[in-house]
Amino acid sequence: MTKDQQNIERGSVINVEILNAAHGGQGIAKYDGRVIFVKGAFPGDRLSANITHVKKKFARATIASIEMPSPLRMQQRCLAAANGAGCCDFGEFDPEIEGRYKADLVLEQLERLGKVSQPPTCEVVSFGSPTQWRTRMRLGVDAQGRAGGFASQSREVVSGVPCSQGVMGLLDGIVGAEQNVLRFTPGSQVVVVCDDLGQRTVVETQPAPRGKRTESMVKVVEGTGKVSQVVDGVTFELPATGFWQSHKDAAQAYADTIREWFGSLIIRNTDSSLVAWDLYGGCGSFASAILSAVDNHGVVHCVESAPAAVSAGKRALSQLVEDQKIVFHTETVERAMNQLPAPTLVVLDPPRVGAGAETVRAIAQSGPQAAIHIGCDPATFARDIAEWSRNGFILEKLRVFDAFPGTHHCETIGLLTKKN
């Protein structure tokens, strides 16, 4: 260990050049043998970094000042982020190459964590405008009752300036000049949604108490508290606080990918005995795509632990439920799998933490011919893919969606097939 390394401690400021990108919106620098992960830094930045955490072989830092910006860095396109909100950490990134940049990070995670030495060609899907794409936002409320985004790595509320992600009209009268906006209960949260029918809903909620998972909706400020979302011509009516894809075009794009990929396979049994699993399936927004990919043969078992989502799915897909083409199970994936008939096809869309090795192993050992795995975190997606590989599956297709432009996040979808 060098003398310089011994002197690095929390609060130290060092000058570095960012050499590579790291998962999670970080840049990588080297400083006297240590790897330095700098939050919000882009390859090519020369900057002063404020050390926040120190380990033997690496340290973490934030940007103190940028001495020479990377060619990738442009003017911040989000006023909220420019004022300290944590919404658009990639708001300064060149949007023309943002999707490819994220795809390269996915490939790096697949190689390093997923042990995929020869990944398939990675398709990149960008949805056009880098702003005005988000249909739902969760806002904090400050002591004066003003709504706004949360500051980066903080619960402090940045009010008065709207985030550029919101679709047209989403935050009108909610976030903006003080004299023109509604006031809310201090300490509450505000959920604002503009649904697929163009209707805006605004609800005030109280965060869930410590140890509880479900928040309480305390006041409907605008609309009915319900939102209507459309996929494959089916309208799902959900609580405003329920889960739905953030990007206005994402849900349909993912359903189209499922239909395309499963439709291209040669399925060994396409009679009425075909079984598909739709795991972490929400309201069943992908179930119609799965069925249409196999010409409506067989049955889709949709597993979801949230009762409100299951109820919404049963209402929206009532005819298919009545015909027993779609069967909903209000249960966790881990508990439901032992009760389901063996699948031919599987779709799984786990939360950000991933499905995990034990769950992937159980799905793989249930004997599907193919699976479509969806992930919103490159690292956990890669770890799940590694477990698929250990259980005899190969990653055949890969598609990265820049579904969260202006942020370091992306959505990744992979097609896995059983090795011969």
UniProtKB/Swiss-Prot annotation:
EC number(s) given by UniProt: 2.1.1.-
Keyword S-adenosyl-L-methionine: yes
Active site: C376 (nucleophile)
Disulfide bonds: none
TRAM domain ranges (all copies): 7-65
One function term, GO molecular function aspect: rRNA (uridine-C5-)-methyltransferase activity
Keyword field contains Ion transport: no
Annotated keywords: Methyltransferase, S-adenosyl-L-methionine, Transferase
Assigned protein family: Belongs to the class I-like SAM-binding methyltransferase superfamily. RNA M5U methyltransferase family.
Name of this chain's protein: Uncharacterized RNA methyltransferase DIP1398
Native organism: Corynebacterium diphtheriae (strain ATCC 700971 / NCTC 13129 / Biotype gravis)
